[in-house]
């Protein structure tokens, strides 16, 4: 940052507020006062899990989701970074089921195994959706630079190789895993771009370019607490 390597990013005054936000999703779940709102029972394992890893089963679940988000908003007044991942779980869960029903594939079972792993370990997962897009008047396959949308570069027996980027990824640096999803509806000609997958944050070939926040250097100034505003919590994003 500013041309210097940061060895202790956990306590860095620009970076720490973002870490504190996602940490709140864990600490409140351990607090008996908020435990009922912050946790749920997994329909896959029957275990108590963080609500951010839950697949909604009822209207009560949906209401509790909103109440949980309001609570965290009151506690942090900032983005707590697990909402898109939670929505991604629910979207991919139902979509993979419908795909398997139609095409006889096994994506749903694959995803359930991954979700159980996430639930058992209470992982933070970044929902990575927004592509750079390039020329927005053109479909992905018509882009001059095909890497403006995440795409399958190579298909192998053991999986796929992908290229591209996701932008404006709030909290991705604080996430254990990423779920990559298409950013828009795709046609047949865009089939290489119609891909969704999960990968760990330390996967080989995955890079994150740290994105700072407006006026974040104010946190470095002496006596800034006079008008700093939200000193303990804040945001960050990355180009992934």
Where do the language-model regions lie?
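FAD-binding core of flavoproteins
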Residues: 127, 132-240
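N-terminal-proximal low-complexity accessory segments that begin disordered
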Residues: 1-26
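Short active-site-adjacent helix-start/loop capping segments
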Residues: 8-9, 45-47, 135-138
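Internal helix-loop-helix
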Residues: 27-125, 177
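Acidic, aromatic-enriched beta-alpha/helix-loop junctions
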Residues: 20-35, 192-198
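Generic structural signal for well-ordered, non-transmembrane alpha-helical segments
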Residues: 16, 20, 116-119, 161
């Amino acid at each position: 940052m500013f041309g210097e390597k940061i060895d202790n990013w956990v306590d860095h005054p620009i970076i720490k507020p973002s870490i504190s936000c996602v940490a709140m999703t864990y600490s409140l779940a351990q607090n008996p006062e908020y435990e009922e709102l912050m946790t749920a029972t997994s329909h896959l394992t029957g275990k108590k899990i963080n609500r951010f890893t839950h697949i909604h089963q009822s209207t009560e679940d949906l209401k509790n989701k909103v109440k949980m988000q309001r609570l965290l908003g009151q506690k942090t007044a900032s983005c707590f970074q697990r909402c898109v991942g939670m929505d991604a779980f629910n979207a991919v869960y139902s979509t993979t089921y419908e795909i398997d029903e139609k095409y006889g594939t096994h994506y749903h079972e694959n995803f359930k195994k991954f979700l159980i792993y996430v639930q058992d370990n209470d992982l933070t997962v970044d929902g990575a959706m927004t592509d750079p897009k390039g020329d927005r008047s053109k479909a992905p396959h018509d882009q001059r630079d095909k890497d403006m949308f995440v795409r399958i570069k190579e298909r192998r027996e053991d999986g796929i190789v992908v290229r591209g980027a996701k932008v404006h990824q709030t909290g991705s640096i604080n996430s254990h895993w990423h779920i990559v999803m298409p950013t828009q509806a795709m046609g047949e000609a865009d089939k290489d771009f119609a891909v969704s997958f999960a990968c760990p944050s330390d996967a080989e070939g995955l890079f994150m370019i740290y994105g700072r926040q407006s006026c974040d250097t104010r946190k470095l100034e002496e006596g800034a607490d006079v008008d700093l505003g939200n000193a303990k919590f804040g945001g960050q994003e990355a180009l992934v």
